[in-house]
């Protein structure tokens, strides 16, 4: 969704800055060349985004309106049916050629939603035992804002954050990731941190509330990873925002070298990038890649 907004050349997105932090060359390639056609992994990832965002939305509305958590299976079944109907309709329109793939993933996704529901119910029970009111417990475990759009003229940034939570200590920003490889997620950790820190900066500007924490929801195994966001991290991203724009004026950055060359093996633009390289791989990079194969 951020890709469309980034077509305005003066605006960048949190995803673009995340690319820059991972590899300036990746950032440059994504700005200068098309992203290409959709792949099975991106389609499934987008579908899961839609599903879990709607789970947040429908679940909060239902539980809040009833003032309690329904304990019947029919309640969850009805909600999941509406969630799938919504997400399938969007995917059928966006990616008709991948519809069979999406259908095959519905059963395991339904199972994960059922486990996620149990997790959320336990979260509410635990908070209630700590003295939280039902309303406060719901607001703690389910987002205040979903798919919130940002547009900052101050920083020339635009984008959407998957979820924002409202807490007594300020806001918490969340991104949904569908990585099915924990090593891949680890290698891209710097990207994730930069992306969420950018969301934090934009949320603070828009809502005039502090953002000291961010979290990633990994939908493949329904677990959360959270981390603190310091002023130092925010200042670093603000500087990267300026540095990234300089690169667009200077031209293609050099390839990664040394230990950083390991990142190339985990980059989705690997083939495109290497086709643009005129020089042979240096010995250190070859050794680094050989160790991963």
Q: What are the functions of these language-model segments?
A:
Residues 23, 48-49, 163, 199, ...:
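A residue-level signal for conserved active-site and pocket-lining positions in enzyme catalytic cores
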